[in-house]
Regions:
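Hydrophobic membrane-insertion alpha-helices, especially the h-region
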Residues: 6-22
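Acidic helix-start/capping segments at beta-turn-to-alpha-helix junctions
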Residues: 61-76
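C-terminal capping alpha-helices of c-type cytochrome domains
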Residues: 107-108, 115-141
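Positively charged n-region of N-terminal signal peptides that target proteins for export
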Residues: 1-4
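Polytopic transmembrane helical bundles with strong interfacial aromatic enrichment
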Residues: 20-23, 139-141
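Electrostatic cytochrome c docking/interface patches
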Residues: 26-47
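The canonical Cys-X-X-Cys-His
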Residues: 47-59, 109, 131
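Extracytoplasmic electron-transfer domains, predominantly the class I c-type cytochrome c fold
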Residues: 72-118
Length: 141
């Protein structure tokens, strides 16, 4: 029993020390400079629900994005997502925009781990099809 207490104390100490590492706390949202031409407000709303937290400058940072080590993962995912496709910076080249329809069609996006934590991002089959069709028209290959 004493061993469990020692291990628990060490783990707690490690978690506390992890909070001192500044990585993962850059919760900034740069300005939106230009969005794509959305075919309808409905399509934009679907993209906001399923894509914008990682693929825009309008990220809604969840509480766990401030707690290491989850904060490190969240910041990494957002940085990576914005780097691949950023719906807030269409004044800059978005070379992966053409892949958006295929990613949604194949179930690669939104990521399963994200949907598990953000149920509102789960798309019905009809919503998924609508987003695929819109992305295919907006970002032709």
């Amino acid at each position: 029993m004493k061993r469990v207490g020692i291990i628990g104390g060490v783990l707690l100490a490690v978690l506390v020390v992890m909070q001192l590492v500044p990585k993962g706390r850059n919760h900034t949202n740069p300005p939106v400079t230009q969005e794509p031409a959305w075919p309808s407000p409905e399509v934009r709303a679907l993209a906001v629900r399923a894509c914008f937290d990682c693929h825009s400058n309008e990220t809604k940072w969840p509480w766990y994005a401030s707690v290491a080590p989850a904060s490190w993962l969240v910041e990494h995912h957002v940085e990576e997502g914005r780097g691949e496709l950023n719906f807030s910076e269409f004044d800059k080249p978005q070379r992966h925009a053409k892949d958006a329809a295929e990613e949604v069609r194949e179930g690669e996006m939104p990521m399963a781990g994200y949907v598990a934590l953000h149920g509102e991002a789960k798309l019905s089959e009809a919503e998924k099809q609508r987003l695929v069709e819109a992305f295919a028209a907006m970002f032709p290959r």
